[in-house]
């Protein structure tokens, strides 16, 4: 996937890829990835033995029903986003059995957006259900609340800075 912005001049002294909603990126390269999340969800995944990782930024665009993510029409965007990232990681040598995750975002907005807290809750529910179904260990979760988060991810080490 082509990344919107690549910065070579930053405090990390390595390439920094900035992701926007809908972007995903997986790499073996010694670099950083960054984004800002509000209602959207940033998922950072990495394969520690192979020192590769990736990030995706998406939002489940509505309130999910009670039938679970496999049959929920609204959850399809989240599933598609996650599978794009997982596929990219596997293409460059990742092994799903070793993948670990860190998840951020799904905050709600006090800006008058209708159903903001319900959408945030749907995003939280979606991502937890996805990782449970995929049997992927979530090492860190910082979700919900009424604030934004700035995330920097080092994909080779799986380190996240806020």
Model-based region annotation:
Residues 1-29:
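Basic, amphipathic N-terminal segments that precede the first structured/catalytic domain
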Residues 108-120:
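Phosphate/ribose-phosphate-bearing ligand recognition and processing surfaces
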Residues 59-64, 105-109, 144-146:
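Acidic, glycine-rich active-site loops and adjacent beta-strand->loop/helix elements
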Residues 97-105:
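Short glycine-rich phosphate-binding loop at a beta-alpha junction
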Residues 22-23, 29-34, 43-45, 91, ...:
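A generic local secondary-structure boundary/capping motif
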Residues 30-92:
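Conserved mixed alpha/beta catalytic, RNA-binding, or beta-rich assembly cores of soluble enzyme
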Residues 78-85, 99, 123, 127:
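Amphipathic alpha-helical interface surfaces
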Residues 118-162:
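Divalent-metal-activated hydrolytic enzyme cores
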